[in-house]
Amino acid sequence: MVRFKKRYFVVQFDRERDSYDPLSNKDSFKKRAFQDSWPLHIKDHDLALAVKDIVEHIHGDFGRAAITTGLRAIYSNPETHLAMIQCRHGPHRLVGSSLPFLKSIGNEKLVPKLIYTGATIKNCFKVKDIIIFNFL
């Protein structure tokens, strides 16, 4: 029996802002994502479908076929705007290189920030807890 290795991505989403100035105050921008009153209402299926579409747009049919069998969104929190994506080892490089180009999920215009890429879901949940603890 063969074990399939997996990789996990921890991603934080923020609404796309037209007036964002990266030099103004970076700490307030990080904290604002948690303090906004808008919850992130996206379904895991919509997130996985958006990732598949952007990988196909960037890497073509090969990229879509490589990630289709092992890609799924396993966690999304509407309050902290964090999500976790699971992918097979190997094609995870295609997913990681395509995530910065993701601009919308469903009707939501979002800006993704790749926080962490890990081999175990346990480490991803540790990172998630650290992020929530530091910014709340």
Which role does the model predict for each range below?
Residues 8-14:
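Active-site-flanking beta-strand signature of metal-NTP-handling nucleotidyl enzymes
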Residues 100-110:
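A common structural junction motif
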